[in-house]
Amino acid sequence: MQNAKRKMQNCQGFSLLELMIAMFILIILLSVALPTYQYTVQHARETVLKENIRQIENAIDQYAADKGKLPQSIDELVEAKYLREKPVDPITEKTEWDQVMGDDAFSSEGGQGLVDVKSLAEGEDSDGKPYKDY
């Protein structure tokens, strides 16, 4: 019986103060790590946005070189297999883009065609540049 009491006295748990100190340290670590994580995620989205716009612009150029005219939309680039699918804007999380139409210098008939794409996202990136200026 005394042996059991002695074992119970040696098996003490954490005190409330020790638990509070551990929680305080965790809160400090999270307050440092969370903004870094959020910045990294935002920077990754901006990088993907730039890459998606670059891929669309390259597809426009390749389409114009092959067909002798500009495409009329991003959907036409997908249908003609210059893009696998309509890219997603990682900021808005939609496949909608501002499709900039302009004079078709490639076509002998003239007319208008897709010359550029812009993001429809509001706001600015982490460097202060508006998403619409990408």
Model region roles, listed by residue range:
Residues F14, V48-L49, D61-Y63:
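A generic structural signal for short
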Residues C11-Y37:
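N-terminal single-pass transmembrane signal-anchor helix
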